[in-house]
Amino acid sequence: MALNLRINRQIRAPRVRVIGSAGEQLGILSIKEALDLAKEANLDLVEVASNSEPPVCKIMDYGKYRYDVTKKEKDSKKAQHQVRIKEVKLKPNIDDNDFLTKAKQARAFIEKGNKVKVSCMFRGRELAYPEHGYKVIQRMCQGLEDIGFVESEPKLNGRSLICVIAPGTLKTKKK
């Protein structure tokens, strides 16, 4: 948030509505009286609403106000979690141990809150038997259904079969 508020001598209006440091209304005063009140309290006069008539000014510590606003912005950015799509690549004739390793990797991605794109790559004549790829993808989806749900059903896209699994359960998705 850009803090481009007018403070103290930057305020151009001859009369302003003043709000005290505790939030109480002090009324409409001349700019000189308002600045004197702020100076007595060792605080700043900050124009918070310049588009009203007369402009609204508040007596506050501007440095502390700026610090609080930037701190709130940082906290809100920390609270946001960006969902990334991670990919796990499989082959239609994958061995059991290799499959378990890939399933463990996909489980770790989902537990961290990321979506997982499971793709089964076909090479050469493997494309003649896409049902083998569907079986591998279905096995992966069934292994992860306790922590995630199938966001997009398996689709054949060129030489690969693609499916997306998202974190959560199907019940939380529908809400």
From Swiss-Prot:
Gene, per the UniProt record: infC
Entry protein name: Translation initiation factor IF-3
Assembly, per entry: Monomer.
InterPro entries given in the database record: T_IF-3_C_sf (IPR036788), T_IF-3_N_sf (IPR036787), Translation_initiation_fac3_CS (IPR019813), Translation_initiation_fac_3 (IPR001288), Translation_initiation_fac_3_C (IPR019815), Translation_initiation_fac_3_N (IPR019814)
Keyword Cytoplasm: yes
Classification of source organism: Bacteria, Pseudomonadati, Chlamydiota, Chlamydiia, Chlamydiales
Cell location: Cytoplasm
Classification via Gene3D superfamilies: Translation initiation factor 3 (IF-3), C-terminal domain, Translation initiation factor 3 (IF-3), N-terminal domain
Organism of this sequence: Chlamydia trachomatis serovar D (strain ATCC VR-885 / DSM 19411 / UW-3/Cx)
One Pfam family in the UniProt entry: IF3_C
